[in-house]
Amino acid sequence: MKKIFIECCIESYIEAINAEKKGADQLELCSDLNNDGLTPNFDVVKKVIRNISMPIKIMIRPRGGDFNYSGENMVEIKKQITYVKTIGINHIVFGVMNKDHRVDIDNIKRVSDWSFPMKITFHKAIDASAEFFTDIEALVNTKRIDSLLTSGKSTTAESGASIIKKVISFYGKNIKVISAGKITKSNLNNIHRKISGSYYHGRKILGKLC
């Protein structure tokens, strides 16, 4: 079985420490994962980056609910991006959709301008797209998105495996496709056999962290 890249989704400093000890390749730091993740507390961010040597992504999401952001929301998003850039973060996770459940390319370009030269991973919000493959292609064509989190339009990576495999086949040379959605230490190998991807993401992908 080929080497796979493990991205561990965490909420706290102790989870970051334990994920590093267990061999994670990268961390995604969020808050409120029960709500699909929000922007983490910046004191936690600073503590993690002071003490962890591996690559770290930061979620940028100012509120729960949908991903159709108001002008006021976008102002807050810009503030959050500006701040995490100043403290040394070089990769963010972000998603934005319009009222028609399509990727909001205009706001993606704004966020890319604000965050440059940071990398961007597009959030699993892509799974709610009314035109899933068309919107992934639009993201790829911006040449501003490094990677994409997806459950293949399903609730779990396992049930969406066939769609994820198609995404990798169509776009994997242009964007990192990160399989996500209830991936755990116990089901990772089975999911990998179905998808044959390179990148996997989960809160319990390395088992319990605290």
Regions from the PLM with identified roles:
Residues 11-22, 58, 68-83, 106-108, ...:
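Catalytic cores of alpha/beta
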Residues 5-18, 22-38:
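N-terminal beta1-alpha1 ligand-phosphate binding loop
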Residues 2-6, 23-25, 52-56, 88-90, ...:
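Short, well-ordered coil/turn segments that N-cap beta-strands
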Residues 41-106, 207-209:
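Glycine/small-residue-rich loop that forms an oxyanion/phosphate-binding "nest" at active or ligand-binding sites
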Residues 117-156:
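Histidine/lysine/aspartate-rich catalytic loop segments that bind and position anionic ligands
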Residues 25-38, 83, 87-99, 143-158, ...:
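Glycine-rich phosphate-binding active-site loops on the catalytic face of alpha/beta enzymes
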Residues 99-103, 107-111, 121, 127, ...:
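Active-site pocket-lining/capping segments in soluble small-molecule metabolic enzymes
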Residues 9-13, 32, 59-65, 97-99, ...:
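Active-site beta-loop-alpha junctions enriched in small/polar residues
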